[in-house]
């Protein structure tokens, strides 16, 4: 319905939003029916412009610093009021949505956007409930005003844009930016703060389930394979990015997928390919003269995206929930070419590698990245989104693994035979074969070889995988150079881990420099 006075459109349909976006010049229709929108100079998240309001109710529980920057309550009130005044005479789009597919752990949220395509994104990525807010919880508010220009000296921001979370008032303000991923990550951060207090582990992971009800989780930073590997034609998708793990099961925090599109192919990623159709939002994807998307074109950004609802996936778990996971996979993209394609972790090693979050920024989702690929340590495989101290999440992970008996694996989707530029990246079929072996239970109680420097147990055989690939030293022509790189990586792990206050059992579970 539309409010004729203020031109406010409540809970608009997909078709209406696509029509509005085209009429208002916000995007273009592609040959496959998707809507392409461009986000201007900000083609990724803006971590330097993300703040949390520092107020008494939550201040003691947040790890303040460069990731979670403090914002004054008074400054927030002023900025919120200025944005509301800015939007007062604008045509707006509003939906009542939910975040969290669990009937106990959802958060209701009213999303107000200046752009039609942002509203379509929100309706694709959040959950459209059959009945809004059944438990009558206090409702969160998101306001997204991309055309509002922040003034640092007036507003207390760092630039002309800001993303601000206010836990006390249940408000999220997005001003001055068009990149839609900020909306979903803001509510992910909200749930990452709220869920641990309810005994639930929030996770930056994808999840799927087999025909027998066996759940697998895939942790990893953007570009390491979460979406690709969980979109398995033989299994049912729960979700591709954000989940909660409660006693008794896992649930999707979202209602859609936000898949990277760079180099997307029908052959390697058929599930994602088929999901891109009418109703999908394509961010910063370039088209040819016939409006056919060119997924190889990175002229606007490496971080091209497709946002679509889970309903676009044929093989999915319709309630967005699953049993507790038998297998947990940590996806790492090792640019040094040192890590094996798969390692079997003890629970102490799981805690160590969860806290370390070693991986790479692949076609980084953050603006201002100087290099397309660089190694990084990202706590909990998602440091930018976790407001509480890392130990809170690591303890919850250990607790869940122990109580259910999940087996954790470290899977390298990065390089072998040498570092990036010399070695070659593991291809998707090889990694898929490893994942198949993991989910089938093949790698439980198998013969392993121990890699001393890395302190990892590696299986000697995996069905469908060349055995020479399993021990990384075999893929390097210069064995001495491999040993040198392995020592360098072990030293980097040790240096990064020094900041954590953990038990000796966990500290000793890491690589040995």
From Swiss-Prot:
The record's free-text note on cofactor binding: Binds 1 Mn(2+) ion per subunit.
Any one biological process term the GO annotation gives: gluconeogenesis
Catalytic activity: oxaloacetate + ATP = phosphoenolpyruvate + ADP + CO2
EC number: 4.1.1.49
Domain of life assignment: Bacteria
Ligand binding (Mn(2+)): 185, 204, 241
Protein name (database record): Phosphoenolpyruvate carboxykinase (ATP)
The organism of origin for this protein: Shewanella oneidensis (strain ATCC 700550 / JCM 31522 / CIP 106686 / LMG 19005 / NCIMB 14063 / MR-1)
